[in-house]
Amino acid sequence: MEPDRQTDIAALDSTLTTVERVLDVEGLRTRIEKLEHEASDPKLWDDQVRAQRVTSELSHAQGELRRIEELRRRLDDLPVLYELAAEERAAAAASGMEAFAEADAELKALRVDIEATEVRTLLSGEYDEREALITIRSGAGGVDAADWAEMLMRMYIRWAEQHKYGVEVLDTSYAEEAGVKSATFAVHAPFAYGTLASEQGTHRLVRISPFDNQSRRQTSFAEVEVLPVVEITDHIDIPEGDVRVDVYRSSGPGGQSVNTTDSAVRLTHVPTGLVVTCQNEKSQLQNKVSAMRVLQAKLLERKRLEERAELDALKGRGGSSWGNQIRSYVLHPYQMVKDLRNEYEVGNPTAVLDGDIDGFLEAGIRWRNRRDIS
């Protein structure tokens, strides 16, 4: 095998060994055995919340172990692929060069997969393994901003669907002409919050407005908020008297009523002024339950931001307002999507807006990790 390829394989082996150590593969196997024992208990489903937690954690742990074992198998097979290619080339077989090309392609693909798994080891924050709640709000830019907010919503949902993650739309407030004023949805997947947390902030779009008769260039803004789903262990207790409940009829695009009953729910947390709405469920009770989940998540985030502000003050640095512009999507006069915090950029905004955002998410995870340890 050529020295360069040997060096590349050795580097990948070192990275994968580090990943295996950080993820504690043997500990993961022990954890799976324990969870499998719990899952086999006939009385487990007497407690629905515990049962869902156990089965979800078991599925995630099994998936992590399969992923690591598959990467190790592929890496161990790689030298064999190069040896076979060398033998074919030595025998002057026409397939020799083709075999080398296939081995090089596997080396490249394996590097991408190992680096992506390495990024997962950075998700060690207190809430990183949680599912995520995403709220998108249109900002400055009128109808273009509302359309931009809906484009962002589609981008994240497409990303989740491509990864076979569950998505639950909790609330959508449609704008009069096009797009949405705001939308809230949940991404049901382990580590969804840690993966998406760095998406929080203001996203800027520059394009020729499809709503302008003179086809002028328009700059639009939308804000993205990412929260971890609250669990019972977070102890976010909200006294009943602290919440005002208002009900109203669900509405669709253009303000058109889509329900003949007052099923939509608006919760106002009186002490803080936080407001949450939910209208996508079929019943008022379901909407109230979903809205309470979002309110609990917002209160948890408020508590975390207060704690972070105190830490920032101790470290002598400014706070981290989530309203800061983080990414620019330019469709005209050139095409580019660029993250303003870590300089990661791509020249294909169409693919990005269709959900191809893994590169930005990985760069964001690395950026957040550097920020948090600084």
Curated annotation (Swiss-Prot):
Keywords: Cytoplasm, Methylation, Protein biosynthesis. InterPro entries: PCRF, Pep_chain_release_fac_I, Pep_chain_release_fac_I_sf, PrfB. It is found in: Cytoplasm. HAMAP family: Rel_fac_2. Peptide chain release factor 2 directs the termination of translation in response to the peptide chain termination codons UGA and UAA. One of its GO terms (molecular function) is translation release factor activity, codon specific. The keyword Cytoplasm applies. This is Peptide chain release factor 2. Belongs to the prokaryotic/mitochondrial release factor family. It comes from Mycobacterium leprae (strain TN). It holds the Pfam family PCRF. Methylated by PrmC. Methylation increases the termination efficiency of RF2. The modification N5-methylglutamine is found at residue 256.
